[in-house]
UniProtKB/Swiss-Prot annotation:
Name of the protein this chain belongs to: Topoisomerase 1-associated factor 1
One Pfam family cited in the UniProt record for this chain: TIMELESS
Bias type Basic residues, positions: 1060-1071
Family: Belongs to the timeless family.
Source organism phylogeny: Eukaryota, Fungi, Dikarya, Ascomycota, Saccharomycotina
Gene name of the record: YBL053
GO terms for MF: DNA binding
Length: 1263
């Protein structure tokens, strides 16, 4: 044909930037491209640089607000469009065909360059509007592509086929650029904001022209361009082929996304938005761009089939990263603004079925017997909705007006108690008092009117309501069914889900992509759920066609999407997340609400029911896995009233479904476990036996053998899993902020359906009747709302009867509360959520906090106290009672006096009874952490407790005289407060903390005698019964053992002073002897200097019977047992860092004895001297006094000398040691060093010097 004949120069005309807008270039290429000035920029700069003559400018004909540069730009675009081609009037064909110009392809490329140079880089719409004025899309691009499609359909021969295809692709690319949807946002420039409404009208006109020209033949031409690409296998496709397919999908997406501009950009005035004539360009109606027309054109031109093909083949035949997002957005735009019920439920057009009208017949409007044709236009359906709303309001308005006097006016004067008159006009004011006051309230002008913020509906609703006629409903129903049955939905969701999970942060993904993903999931879940509900014959819950939406990946994504949207306050995204969350809950509830039809129970049906229950429980367990997610769900309804009505409706429905689900789970005995993460608190961590941190860490090394468990215990965050308590969780949804949300929602009762009103009533019924939280609804706004709702509802309706019953019960309870509180100021405000306010308003009593037993936070043991000097018993009681009064413990003293009197009475009846104090948990804590109370109890004669489970016990040795005297003194000084001491000193001045270490007077007074020749002293495993820490672990047994061993010599001397053995000693009144060296030696014992000075000195150790038993074992058995003990001891000491228990000391003693007997003389001398000087073991010789005295008089040495002696011992004895030797000597030294640190400063254990490297003195090292 001559229409497409062109020169050879056009055949060879090809540039690399044909699809440069849709091909990703590297950063260097982009910078080079930006640095090069385009011809359009040069011309514009040359035009704007010279100064224009003012007279010439004034005389030039320009449009309003149009510059000379804009006029020249439009002229240049007009020239390019004219050079592109036009109708060939020389042809005999009518209408005349379109003929391309000689440089048509170059003109198309120049126009694209102008768009890139001006519109994209300068953020403007100048070129796009110039193209619209020139009629580029309407008169050129659409005609060119449709004419090419006709020739291809008729299989006509086209010359220069390559150039023609390039021209078609250039036209397609320009169509995509000129129809790209625009959104009003902050990123728009000032010129774009001014031209926003104009460019939106241009897009609407493009949409109409594409859909209406030859019934959308342009779409068929675009699909024909992409057919060769689809026919190729994925391996054979080139990047250019993928870009062509992407262009076609973008064109489909653009047509679906084009909508008329909103009436206003404000978030406060979008209610009931409707398209007016000013929002549409001339010659365009709502039917031209409606979803019905779009679906009809798409079906006719195989567009829906193309979407099904690509969606079902993503990941296999087509790249999911390149095409998945576009397909998902196209599906989302098709279903946006529509509910699943609108697609499923067929509209009822009357009792007589109406046949589809023939295209060749016109309905007879005069014939009354012919049924009315259904309304198929968008304007007609919108008019039907308006008429229905009008009739509803008219019915409500006229139901209380008498028909006889309805046409007459009325004037009513109302006089208040303060003689003020108010005039009300109108017939409705005469009905009753409520109507009169309501009429009076309407005349008030409110200063602060509350508006809804329409800031959360962008991804859920369209700018204008969507009306679906029968044709569109049928097309969409068939498309959705094919989309589900063909597996396209599951494939699309799986591909997009894997793509989203590959992103490290969802905030980096486009917000529209995430919204379209979750909205599509929620819509198809709703569709499948309602389809199953409508199918009364098939009771099987088949969610296989939407199974990909119920996968583990989607639950992770929805929880993350929920959190991110709420944290950054993206209300549009949060609205979509709540809709998806609501659908998942409704699916779970529908499974639990299903009943088995055959009660006898067929096997298949019961097994299917169990499978469905597992599905429902799996949904709930995955949704409620984290505590922070549940907290977000509780917080969302508290502020829902500040957003759009749809957002508020979804929030209320989510709460309603959740409460219903919790009730179902409790009845079905479903157990949910929720995870909570918290930061590890060092202060609140439970200590093992109340030890300090360093000791606890060493014990953990022994308890937890693996490093993995140790790392887990020292993690910064602790994850706990606990069972979800449905009752406590349900109580969180009855917060006063959520109650206010429900009241605000119900206040719009005129716009709510009966089912939505019942939802609100069920919430209030659950709060007021079931939970009996009466004060939560004693609010004036709620009472007024109930009265208005009752008057609004039609008389005799079941809903009004329910409201009246609730009002009757409510006022009955409120009347009782009003009699108790004659001035209920609280009804004016929402109730405070603290327990004190709740209990007081409900019962009239002051709230007392319940005592809870805290096992995680045990009280800290108070330090032991003593008086600064000797006081008599009267002064002692006086000081301690006065100090407890200073601490405001008067009630504690009263209770103690009562307990002492009770104990005295019990002792009179039974003198041998052991009395205990009947204390509460709070008093038990004081027994441990209050040093003054412990001191007082110790003076009385009680055995002090050390844990919350223990109570003070009064032994039978305390006589009645002492007990009665102490009780009278406590009474005396308790009633004589305040007491003035000498020099106005406070009572705590006369009390001080007892010094740590050995107390000789206390030992001589309380401790029983030990035979220092008794060998069992060295291996005593029980702690001192009179010690102030008899509940701690074996580490404290070691400390107590050390004190007992080191004080043998002092006890001998004290016996000589106080009397002979077996004779009772009197209480010592003398002060402690000043022996600072001795006390310091008790805190830190060191190796004497003579061990360093004389290595040849030997001390005989006669404790061999404790090293090995006198049994009949053979040498092999002894060696085997020895090596087992050696390995066991080495492992224990390595794990514990040198800390040994009493059983381990036995093992150490045996090894040391082997060293002494098995080595040479030098080794035996060194071992014997170390055993004697360190003082761990008791010798059998009779010269214990000399040994103890020698150890006491020896001067300590530093740790460096300690290390030197063991190193020298290793060098000298390494060759002489047998296989029975080991590294125990150095371990024992470290044991002593650690114990000395515990004795000296148990609170500062973290400052202990690091351990030295252990010395291995065995034959293994020689090898």
């Amino acid at each position: 044909m001559s229409d497409y004949e062109s020169g050879s120069d056009i055949d060879n005309y090809y540039e690399a930037d044909e699809f440069d807008d849709f091909i990703e270039y590297s950063d260097n290429e982009v910078e080079q491209e930006k640095s090069k000035p385009t011809p359009g920029q040069i011309e514009v700069e040359e035009i704007e640089e010279p100064e224009e003559d003012r007279i010439r400018t004034l005389t030039t004909t320009l449009k309003p607000n149009e510059t000379q540069a804009q006029k020249l730009l439009k002229a240049h675009i007009s020239v390019l469009v004219s050079a592109l081609g036009g109708p060939d009037h020389t042809s005999d064909i009518q209408p005349p065909p379109y003929k391309l110009g000689h440089d048509a392809l170059a003109c198309l490329k120049d126009i694209k360059r102008w768009i890139r140079a001006v519109d994209e880089k300068k953020n403007n719409y100048e070129v796009a509007l110039a193209c619209a004025e020139s009629g580029l899309v309407t008169n050129d691009l659409i005609v060119i592509m449709c004419q090419w499609e006709d020739k291809m359909q008729k299989k006509e021969i086209i010359k220069n086929k390559t150039t023609t295809e390039k021209t078609m692709l250039a036209c397609l690319e320009l169509l995509v650029l000129l129809t790209w949807p625009v959104e009003f946002g902050k990123d728009l420039s000032e010129s774009q904001k001014l031209l926003y409404s104009e460019i939106k009208k241009v897009h609407v006109s493009y949409k109409k022209q594409i859909l209406m020209f030859n019934n959308g033949q342009l779409l068929k031409a675009a699909i024909r361009l992409v057919l060769p690409t689809i026919a190729k296998s994925r391996i054979d496709r080139e990047p250019r082929d993928n870009q062509i397919l992407k262009l076609v999908l973008y064109l489909i997406r653009n047509l679906l996304a084009i909508e008329p501009a909103n009436l206003s950009i404000s978030n406060k005035s979008r209610k009931g938005a409707s398209v007016t004539a000013s929002d549409l360009p001339l010659g365009v109606t709502q039917d031209d761009i409606s979803i019905n027309n779009v679906l009809s054109v798409f079906k006719k031109n195989k567009v829906l089939m193309l979407l099904l093909t690509i969606s079902g083949s993503l990941g296999t035949e087509f790249d999911r990263d390149m095409f998945g997002e576009i397909c998902l957005e196209s599906i989302y735009l098709i279903i946006k603004g529509l509910s699943a019920s609108e697609v499923l439920v067929k509209k009822n057009l009357g009792s007589t079925p109406v046949a589809a009208p023939s295209q060749n017949t016109v309905p007879d409007a005069i014939n009354a017997s012919q049924p009315l044709q259904p309304v198929t236009t968008t304007v007609g359906m919108q008019l039907q909705d308006l008429l229905a709303t009008e009739s509803k309001k008219k019915k409500i308005q006229t139901q209380n007006i008498a028909s006889r006097h309805g046409r007459f006016g009325s004037l009513l004067s109302i006089r208040s108690a303060d003689s003020n008159s108010f005039v009300v006009s109108g017939q409705e004011a005469l009905i009753n008092t409520d109507s009169s006051l309501a009429k009076l309230d309407k005349s008030k002008k409110w200063k602060d009117r509350t508006y809804f913020k329409y800031d959360s509906d962008e991804y859920v609703n369209t700018s204008t309501p969507v009306y679906l006629n029968l044709t569109g409903q049928d097309i969409l129903y068939n498309f959705v069914e094919q989309f589900l049955s063909g597996g396209c939905f599951n494939n699309l969701i799986e591909c997009m889900g894997s793509r989203l999970t590959s992103q490290t942060d969802l905030n980096m993904v486009d917000e529209l992509t995430l919204a379209s993903y979750f909205f599509t999931i929620s819509w198809f879940l709703s569709y499948q759920r309602e389809r199953i509900g409508l199918d009364s014959e098939n009771k099987e819950l088949n969610y296989g066609s939407v199974g990909a939406a119920l996968s583990e990946v989607n639950f992770i994504l929805i929880i993350g999407y929920f959190r991110d949207s709420f944290s950054v306050k993206k209300w549009n995204s949060l609205h979509v997340a709540m809709i998806c969350f609501k659908e998942l809950l409704q699916i779970s509830n529908s499974v639990f609400g299903k009943e088995i039809t055959n009660q006898t129970g067929e096997g298949d049906e019961i097994s299917q029911h169990e499978i469905d229950r597992e599905l429902a429980e799996g949904i709930i367990r995955k949704l409620f896995s984290f505590n922070d997610f549940l907290s977000i769900i509780v917080q969302i309804p508290q502020t829902a009233a500040k957003h759009s009505p749809d957002y508020l409706r979804v929030s209320v429905s989510v709460v309603h479904i959740l409460l219903k689900a919790f009730e179902t789970f409790a009845n079905e005995d479903v157990h949910l476990y929720i995870q909570s993460k918290r930061k590890q608190s060092k202060r609140n961590r439970k200590r093992v036996n109340n030890l300090d941190k360093s000791t606890e860490d060493r014990l953990r090394d022994v308890i937890y053998a693996s490093d993995e468990e140790l790392d887990q215990s020292s993690a910064k965050e602790i994850t706990q899993e606990r069972k979800l308590d449905f009752k406590k969780t349900e109580a969180r949804f009855f917060h006063q902020a959520i109650v206010s949300t429900y009241i605000n929602y119900l206040s719009r009762y005129e716009d709510l359906s009966n089912q939505e009103i019942k939802t609100c009533l069920s919430y209030f019924h659950r709060l007021f009747v079931v939970r009996k939280d009466f004060t939560g609804l004693y609010r004036l706004d709620f009472m007024q709302l109930l009265q208005k709702l009752r008057n609004y509802l039609q008389r005799g309706s079941s809903l009004r009867l329910q409201v009246e019953e609730f009002i009757y019960y409510f006022m009955k309870k409120f009347k009782t509360a009003f009699e108790r509180f004659p001035m209920p100021i609280e009804v004016l405000f929402p109730r405070f959520e603290d327990n004190e306010c709740k209990v007081y308003l409900a019962t009239g009593e002051v709230y007392e906090k319940e005592e809870t037993t805290s096992t995680s936070r045990s009280p800290r043991l108070a330090k032991d106290l003593e008086f600064v000097r000797d006081f008599g018993l009267d002064d002692q009681i006086k000081i301690l009672v006065s100090q407890l009064h200073v601490q405001e413990k008067q009630s504690l003293l009263k209770w103690l006096i009562q307990e002492l009197e009770r104990i005295i009475n019990d002792r009179i009846l039974n003198s041998d009874s052991i009395a205990e104090l009947n204390a509460s948990n709070q008093q038990r804590r004081l027994f441990i952490n209050n040093g003054y109370l412990r001191f007082l109890l110790r003076i009385i004669g009680f055995d002090l407790p050390y844990t919350m489970e223990e109570v003070p016990e009064l032994a039978t040795t305390v006589d009645m005289e002492h007990l009665t005297k102490v009780t009278e003194l406590i009474k005396k000084w308790d009633s004589s407060q305040p007491v003035i001491f000498e020099d106005d000193k406070v009572p705590s001045y006369f009390v001080r903390t007892r010094e740590a270490g050995y107390d000789e007077d206390q030992y001589n007074e309380n401790d029983q005698e030990y035979d220092f020749n008794d060998d069992s002293i060295a291996f005593e495993t029980e702690a001192n019964p009179n010690s102030n820490r008899n509940h701690v672990s074996e580490l404290d047994h070691l400390e107590e053992l050390e004190r007992q061993l080191s004080s043998n010599g002092s006890r001998v001397n004290s016996k000589e002073r106080n009397g002979t053995k077996g004779k009772a000693r009197k209480k010592s009144k003398e002060k402690k002897r000043p022996e600072p060296k001795k006390v310091r030696g008790l805190k830190r014992r060191r190796i004497p200097k003579d061990l360093l000075d004389d290595d040849d000195s030997q001390h005989v150790v006669k404790s061999a019977e404790f090293v090995h038993d006198s049994d009949d074992e053979s040498d092999d058995e002894k060696d085997k047992a020895f090596f087992e003990r050696e390995e066991k001891m080495r492992n224990l000491l390595n794990d514990m860092g040198g800390i040994a228990t009493s059983e381990q000391l036995k093992e150490i003693q045996k090894v040391w004895k082997n060293l002494e007997t098995g080595g040479n003389n030098k080794v035996a001398s060194t071992v014997a001297k170390a055993v004697k000087e360190v003082g761990l073991f008791v010798e059998e010789s009779d010269n214990d006094d000399e040994v103890e005295e020698e150890s006491r008089n020896s001067a300590p040495v530093n740790e460096e000398a300690d290390r030197t002696i063991f190193e020298s011992g290793e060098v000298d004895t390494q060759q002489d040691l047998s296989d029975n030797t080991s590294n125990t000597s150095d371990m024992e030294s470290e044991t002593e060093t650690t114990k000395r640190s515990f004795v000296e400063d148990p609170e500062e254990i973290s400052h202990v010097q690091p351990k030295r490297k252990r010395l291995v003195i065995s034959d293994d090292e020689e090898e």
